[in-house]
Amino acid sequence: MKEAPVIKLRELLNLLPHRYPFLLVDKVLSYDLEKRSIVAQKNVTINEPFFVGHFPEVPIMPGVLILESLAQAAGVLLGLVLENDRNKRLALFLGIQKAKFRQAVRPGDILTLSAEFSLISSKGGKASARACVGSQVAAEGELSFALVDKQSLD
């Protein structure tokens, strides 16, 4: 059964500053603001620009981009939490702890990206995140973010 997205691409573009070729979330399947959790999806295709060099004979999605996909999914939830401040503030990915890569991600895979925040404050947040292909965990870790005023980045 195919899951209908609750947030499609057009709305994602309002929630994330990323654009092609660096937009690594295709849709949001579900989110819960009370539980501070989100489930999103990235469809991995052979047309991804990183497959040109990583690796042409055996294409594998770079682990760092799997982590970036997780950070973007979590960033969508922060964008929803910020709501009215979204145009003034930006969530910046600060770091990752306890990152583990458990399975290669290849063209044709569908990455399910889930994140749950243990902390969201006016300064930032922390979330546990996991990327899966089917029922297999591909990568996981603990993400941290800073919330900054966009004007401070000028």
From Swiss-Prot:
Keywords from the UniProt entry: Cytoplasm, Lipid A biosynthesis, Lipid biosynthesis, Lipid metabolism, Lyase
Gene Ontology cellular-component annotations: cytoplasm; membrane
Coiled-coil segments: none
UniProt-listed InterPro entries: FabA_FabZ (IPR013114), FabZ (IPR010084), HotDog_dom_sf (IPR029069)
Domain of life: Bacteria
GO annotation terms (biological process): fatty acid biosynthetic process; lipid A biosynthetic process
Residues annotated as the enzyme's active site: H54
One Pfam family hit: FabA
Keyword Lyase in record: yes
Compartmental location: Cytoplasm
EC number of the protein: 4.2.1.59
Reaction catalysed by this enzyme: a (3R)-hydroxyacyl-[ACP] = a (2E)-enoyl-[ACP] + H2O
GO molecular function: (3R)-hydroxyacyl-[acyl-carrier-protein] dehydratase activity
Enzyme class: lyase
NCBIfam families for this protein: fabZ, PRK00006.1
Family: Belongs to the thioester dehydratase family. FabZ subfamily.
Role: Involved in unsaturated fatty acids biosynthesis. Catalyzes the dehydration of short chain beta-hydroxyacyl-ACPs and long chain saturated and unsaturated beta-hydroxyacyl-ACPs.
Entry protein name: 3-hydroxyacyl-[acyl-carrier-protein] dehydratase FabZ
Species annotation: Chlamydia caviae (strain ATCC VR-813 / DSM 19441 / 03DC25 / GPIC) (Chlamydophila caviae)
Gene expressing this chain: fabZ
